[in-house]
Regions:
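Mixed-charge, Lys/Arg-rich low-complexity intrinsically disordered regions
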Residues: 101-120
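Cys-His-centered catalytic/binding microenvironment captured across papain-like cysteine peptidases
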Residues: 2-105, 123, 129-135, 143-221
């Protein structure tokens, strides 16, 4: 469905949905996913993706093991965790290949090495998702020829304009779209959304790499 165009030295995918705060699409993973999929044959609404991922029905809060120490983490509300990504991939019938590099020094994530793959995806009309300069999920929808510069649709750019970012400045996460399968039928989509709502409430949570726990559902309240 997507159309790739050239504007001087810019190679762009047309029609990617704009992102921004104050649009009732504050979960950046789902907002970026809706935007990226909008130019494919697997376009789904923000609301549908929030439902089937379980994020619409999830309360999560991180607390550190040391009661005198940190008791909140900014990652508490984010959507791009393994469980939610897997749920969405199953629903849309499209594998999301997630590359996370938090173990590398800040600012040295190495995604410039992936520039040929990013550009090839854009050339094929398929956006890529990543963290930009700020760790909110963005959509790579274009690039500048003969450079390392990428065009991002993100939550922090000016309306009507993309954000120009070097491939060396993105990360530490990137998501490529991989193999396709059948997506859920409408009744299965609804059924899975209800199931995840119950699962999120009954699940007590899970331990984090940093000493602490992500509490879910009733345990998080």
């Amino acid at each position: 469905n997507s159309k790739v165009t050239r504007q001087e030295h810019r190679i762009l995918i047309d029609g990617v949905i704009e992102l921004g705060w104050g649009k009732n699409k504050e979960t950046t993973y789902i907002g970026a996913l809706e935007s990226a999929l909008s130019v494919t044959d697997r376009a789904f609404s923000y609301e549908s993706l929030m439902a089937v991922s379980g994020l619409a029905f999830r309360v999560r809060w991180w607390r550190g093991e040391d009661e005198e120490g940190q008791q909140f983490c900014p990652s508490s509300p984010v959507g791009e965790f393994e469980t939610e990504v897997e749920r969405v991939s199953n629903a849309i019938g499209w594998v999301q290949s997630v590359d996370v590099r938090f173990d590398r020094p800040e600012g040295h994530y190495g995604f410039e090495e992936d520039l040929p793959q990013i550009q090839a995806s854009i050339d094929a009309g398929m956006p890529v998702m990543c963290y930009g300069k700020i760790m909110d999920v963005s959509v790579v929808y274009g690039y500048i020829e003969d450079s390392c510069d990428l065009l991002l649709m993100d939550y922090h750019g000016k309306p009507g304009e993309g954000t120009l970012v070097s491939a060396s400045q993105i990360g530490p996460m990137m998501i490529f779209f991989g193999a396709k399968a059948d997506h859920y039928a409408a009744d299965t989509w609804f059924e899975r959304a209800l199931f995840t709502a119950i699962e999120n409430f009954e699940n007590k949570g899970f331990k984090s790499k940093t000493p602490g726990m992500y509490y879910l559902g009733e345990a998080a309240i």
